[in-house]
UniProtKB/Swiss-Prot annotation:
This is Lipoprotein-releasing system ATP-binding protein LolD. The complex is composed of two ATP-binding proteins (LolD) and two transmembrane proteins (LolC and LolE). It is a peripheral membrane protein. One of its GO terms (biological process) is protein localization to outer membrane. It comes from Legionella pneumophila (strain Paris). The lineage of its organism: Bacteria, Pseudomonadati, Pseudomonadota, Gammaproteobacteria, Legionellales.
Amino acid sequence: MNDIILTSQKLYKSYHDGTSRVEVLKGVDLAITKGDRIAIIGPSGSGKSTLLHLLGGLDKPTSGLITLGKVDWQKINEKQRCQLRNQQLGFVYQFHHLLPEFTALENVMMPLLLAGMAVKDAEEKAINMLEQVGLKPRLAHKPAQLSGGERQRVAIARALVHQPHCVLADEPTGNLDEATASKVFDLMLELNKKMNTALVIVTHDQRIAERMDRVLVLHEGSLYARE
């Protein structure tokens, strides 16, 4: 039980669409432990990204409990949520969301600087992380000077540079060609194993899902293990 990082209990999320109420999540229970590899699959519009946002404290549930470590997301303010996210979670999206005016190195340094780390220490850690993703020769390049695969590797380095307990990834290879997507995903699995960081991926790609330890299906608001 001590290895549990992130949990949801009886998680509900609904939206109002005009006069009607749309229930996206209906009592979702999930426990994520250290080093987990979890794929979440399901039809488009089933609420996979919504679930990921809730787990990451980027949105609030209609009801239910979400805990990161021993902290209830609902019992802390926005500033505390930001601090907790920066300390314990990493995020990778389909689009890299790198800051275009900054170099690869500066983008990867950003979470460390926001956490109050000294510039020299942040630079050293960021260089090391970029080396691990094979981009040491590209430190000074801005996103526009990098290929799609390279940009996504910078995004992965940024997500992992502070050694989070869990990485939440939403279609991280969705914008890449098949060969590049395979290489990027291989890298994510390698770093997941090396750093013992839990990895939760929302994906439509069955080949990615097949390589994860657990495959969960989100359908009509319910989350269950694929048989």
